[in-house]
């Protein structure tokens, strides 16, 4: 006797089998699969997709427009698709994103207060007010100009947060004073001594990498209660003949923890040097790519859409047409620059973009 086919059998698949499938999906496909039916949604709560890749979030250009609070999401692996977030609140529309970690965003509101926001769950963590820090730090300018300059005083903010416990640490530099940090449970901002003239900060695996304006380079261990300095040196790189063409330099921490100094040239090319060693120039990143603004490298493969041995950066070079709203890729092997994606500026305009890793917090 022929067995009658049950068209609804897909909704009754064992959760163990569904979990094996969910773990292999990209974030976009995982999100689609978990919305198929209640049974699949229930199974998805026990899974986290392994193919977690970086997406690009594009913030609207007019932060003063309270009706313009949705953002556009771009997945490098789906170049023909753009996603829109739901409209967020007015405060978010007027805030500026300064850093990302996973699906969490470090935001600065119009009064220069800091908070951490999860884009997908809408969880929010308000950080300690910084008003007392501004009062303690006298700029020697008029009160009006001091208020205008405060936003720029939050230099190179970085942070880390645990998706489950919500333990976190936030760090940033205050002009030529020092680096401040705050962890979950702290009642105020804390100082890290001997960190004046902060230029660039990076944070990875409980280590803070500090670069000063005058070539100083330090590493701090933040795994304990109090930050401990573990390394102190000058950043030495063999770049004397490039110096006059350098727009700026920035630190990058690779997947293996190697520290690089990346210099951006006036023609939008790049040079890469090692830090903490001979300062030799690097000509290949192997199978990794640099996300310049985030100061990290990612593995480049067919799954995540990134091109190996390349640098992904924002459009801020004078010889690239303004207002094209593009992100760019510089290939270290070919020494050529090309757009990551040409966004249609007639449909939307954005002021800045950040890489992040979309994820759900499943409980």
Swiss-Prot record:
Pfam families found in the cross-reference section: Beta-prop_KIB1-4, F-box
Record-linked SUPFAM superfamilies: F-box domain
Superkingdom of the organism of origin: Eukaryota
Annotated F-box domain residues: 7-58
UniProt cross-references to InterPro entries, sorted A to Z: F-box-like_dom_sf (IPR036047), F-box_BR-signaling (IPR050942), F-box_dom (IPR001810), KIB1-4_b-propeller (IPR005174)
PANTHER family: F-BOX FAMILY PROTEIN-LIKE PROTEIN, OS07G0183000 PROTEIN-RELATED
Protein name in UniProt: Putative F-box protein At4g22170
């Amino acid at each position: 006797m022929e067995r009658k086919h049950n068209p609804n059998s897909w909704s009754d698949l064992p959760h163990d089998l569904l979990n094996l499938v969910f773990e292999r999906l990209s974030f976009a496909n995982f999100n689609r699969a978990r919305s198929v039916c209640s049974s699949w949604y229930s199974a998805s709560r026990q899974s986290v997709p392994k193919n977690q890749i970086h997406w690009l979030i594009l913030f609207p250009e007019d932060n003063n427009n309270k009706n313009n609070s949705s953002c556009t999401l771009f997945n490098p692996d789906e170049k023909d698709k753009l996603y829109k977030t739901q409209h967020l609140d007015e405060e978010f529309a007027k805030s500026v994103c300064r850093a990302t970690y996973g699906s969490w965003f470090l935001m600065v509101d119009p009064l220069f207060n800091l908070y951490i926001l999860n884009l997908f769950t809408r969880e929010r963590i308000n950080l300690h007010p910084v008003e007392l820090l501004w009062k303690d730090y006298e700029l020697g300018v008029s009160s009006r100009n001091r208020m205008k300059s405060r936003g720029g005083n939050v230099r190179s903010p970085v942070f880390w947060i645990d998706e489950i416990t919500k333990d976190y640490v936030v760090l940033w530099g205050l002009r030529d004073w020092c680096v401040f940090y705050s962890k979950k449970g702290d009642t105020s901002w804390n100082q890290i001594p001997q960190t004046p003239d902060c230029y660039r900060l990076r944070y990875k695996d409980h280590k803070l990498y500090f670069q000063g304006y005058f070539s100083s380079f330090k590493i701090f261990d933040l795994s304990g209660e109090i930050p401990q300095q573990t390394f102190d040196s000058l950043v030495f790189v063999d770049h004397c003949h490039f110096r006059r063409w350098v727009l700026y330099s920035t630190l990058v921490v690779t997947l293996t923890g190697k520290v690089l100094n990346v210099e951006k040239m006036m023609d939008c090319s790049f040079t890469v040097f090692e830090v903490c060693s001979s300062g030799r120039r690097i000509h290949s990143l192997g199978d990794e790519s640099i996300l310049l603004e985030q100061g990290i490298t990612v593995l480049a493969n067919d799954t995540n859409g990134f091109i190996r041995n390349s640098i992904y950066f924002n459009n801020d070079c004078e010889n690239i047409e303004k207002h094209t709203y593009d992100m760019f890729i510089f290939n270290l092997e070919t020494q050529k620059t090309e757009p990551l994606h040409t966004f249609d500026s007639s449909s939307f305009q954005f002021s800045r973009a950040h890489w992040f890793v979309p994820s759900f917090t499943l409980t």
